Curated annotation (Swiss-Prot):
Job description of the protein: IF-3 binds to the 30S ribosomal subunit and shifts the equilibrium between 70S ribosomes and their 50S and 30S subunits in favor of the free subunits, thus enhancing the availability of 30S subunits on which protein synthesis initiation begins.
Protein name per UniProt: Translation initiation factor IF-3
Family: Belongs to the IF-3 family.
Main location: cytoplasm
Length: 180
């Protein structure tokens, strides 16, 4: 096992004595502007308040610094990013496979699954696979896809409808309708 020094991960913001500017534009704890002051004066004010001096915008002239609790600032920032990730809905494409001879009972089960996918906000990919002599009866396949499209017309919008057969299958993609 190799020994070594543990390196602290670099902070995104410089704090307290890490700030290199001579003068800074200072913002108070409540967000009020305190004007342009020397770095030492800003550090003293932060120390009096019992919190940190954090460099918010290092590229500004002079750099903008704020008096705040840095630990609390990082916590709020991570909480906000987690909240944003939670709100993002990753749209998945769910696939259901049909055959030209799919019986009515199986059709109803597959249709129920499609309805569930669309209500959850996911896209649905309907693959119609032909085997053997079924290739000669492509019209039956198109009828199945039309039936699915008509049954789901209130829930979904057709994104792509097959005009010709691709290999031994036809693919139709449905997207959920936007809710008003």
């Amino acid at each position: 096992m190799k020994g070594g020094k543990r390196v602290q991960p670099a902070r995104p913001n410089r704090i307290n004595r890490e700030i290199r500017a001579h003068e800074v534009r200072l913002t108070g704890v409540e967000g009020e502007q305190l004007g342009i002051v020397s770095l030492n004066e800003a550090l003293e004010k932060a120390e009096e308040a019992g919190v940190d001096l954090v460099e918010i915008s290092p590229n500004a002239e002079p750099p903008v610094c704020r008096i705040m609790d840095y630990g609390k600032f990082l916590y709020e920032k991570s909480k906000a990013t987690k909240e944003q990730k939670k709100k993002q809905k990753v749209i998945q494409v769910k696939e259901i496979k049909f055959r030209p001879g799919t019986d009515d009972g199986d059709y109803q089960v597959k249709l129920r699954n499609l309805i569930r996918f669309l209500e959850d906000g996911d896209k649905a990919k309907i693959t119609l696979r032909f085997r053997g002599r079924e290739m000669a009866h492509q019209q039956i396949g198109i009828e199945v896809l039309n039936r699915v499209r008509d049954d789901l017309s209130e829930l979904a919008v057709v994104e792509s409808f097959p005009t010709k057969i691709e290999g031994r299958q036809m693919i139709m993609v449905l997207a959920p309708k936007k809710k008003q």
